[in-house]
Amino acid sequence: MTADELRSLIASGLACDHIEVEGDGRHWSAVIVSAEFAGLRPVQRHQRVYRTLGARMHTDEVHALSMKTYTPAEWAAHPH
């Protein structure tokens, strides 16, 4: 799997304002900004992202995914 493929999978299941994905083909890190995260605890945000990936989380395609999740307001206030 490529970073673009992973980015597309996440975007297909979650309305995102911004997505950054980096990784080596199995171990990934992502920054995801979505209004859908409003009012959710961090673990709930991660669960929303995991749902977009479905069974791929249990294969070698996505062995590990580290996430930073933000609402648009949090992202605007975040130094980047």
Predicted regions and their residues:
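N-proximal, solvent-exposed amphipathic alpha-helical segments enriched in charged/polar residues
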Residues: 1-16
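Short edge beta-strands and adjacent turn/loop segments
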Residues: 13-29
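Short beta-turn/strand-loop junction motif enriched in small, turn-promoting residues
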Residues: 16, 37, 54-55
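Short active-site-proximal "capping" loops at secondary-structure junctions
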Residues: 26-28, 37, 72-73
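A short interface-forming secondary-structure element
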Residues: 32-46
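C-terminal structural segments of small proteins and small subunits
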Residues: 47, 51-80
